[in-house]
Amino acid sequence: MTRARFTHRAGEYTLRVTGHADFHSGSDIVCAAASTLVCTLAATLDALDADVTELRLQPGDAAVAALSGPGVRTAFLMACTGFQQLADAYPENVQFT
């Protein structure tokens, strides 16, 4: 199961993603979608020159955190919307809180 958790505290946005979706061995489209969302968030924050406070992109263990700034909220909202859609479509494989 992939678990994605979003938090916003004291002007810092954080998205942590752990685990594997285990949708289909060898061609896991759910894991691929989750990876795409996290990597796109990281790339967007880089393009925004955001103040990134944590960046970890490892298989089964990712974290992206940034201080509030222009475009940062929107970038995290995009990623969170994607994870909510994944969780709705694949509830046995993705959990989003």
Identify the role of each PLM range.
Residues M1-S27, C39-T97:
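N-terminal intrinsically disordered, cationic/polar leader segments
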Residues V30-A34:
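Short, conserved glycine- and acidic-residue-centered signature motifs
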